[in-house]
């Protein structure tokens, strides 16, 4: 009968750890959602509707680029290095600059 109590304690400990893990994961997800909402509010303030639509389109195709671009736009706007609101043409120029820095050129020799 002592063995049954030991197994019960083990199961209870496993359940407790699993619950803690789930709670931590839920808290991290909640924090990520809050951060995303704050970024979205900031972007709505610094981008025109057309530029925001372009950013949303980029997010569909290349989410990692959109996230990097969001961070850069927020940094540019908060430092005053770009005039707010950023219109679609300005966003295109920023994108061109990013592409020119990250684009790789391939040369084939025959």
Swiss-Prot record:
GO molecular function, one term: DNA binding
Source taxon at top rank: Archaea
GO cellular component: cytosol
SUPFAM superfamilies for this protein: Double-stranded DNA-binding domain
Short name of one Pfam family: dsDNA_bind
Keyword field: DNA-binding
Gene3D superfamilies: PDCD5-like
Family matches, as InterPro entries: DNA_bind_arc (IPR022889), PDCD5-like (IPR002836), PDCD5-like_sf (IPR036883)
Family: Belongs to the PDCD5 family.
NCBIfam families in the cross-refs: PRK04239.1
Protein name: DNA-binding protein Pisl_0441
């Amino acid at each position: 009968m002592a063995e049954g109590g030991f197994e019960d304690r083990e199961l209870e400990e496993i359940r407790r750890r699993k619950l803690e893990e789930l709670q931590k994961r839920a808290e991290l997800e909640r924090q990520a959602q809050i951060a995303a909402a704050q970024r979205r509010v900031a972007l709505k303030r610094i981008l025109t509707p057309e530029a925001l639509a372009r950013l949303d389109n980029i997010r569909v195709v290349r989410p990692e680029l959109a996230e990097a671009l969001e961070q850069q736009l927020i940094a540019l706007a908060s430092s005053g290095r770009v005039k707010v609101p950023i219109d679609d043409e300005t966003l295109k120029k920023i994108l061109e600059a990013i592409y020119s820095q990250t684009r790789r050129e391939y040369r084939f020799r025959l």
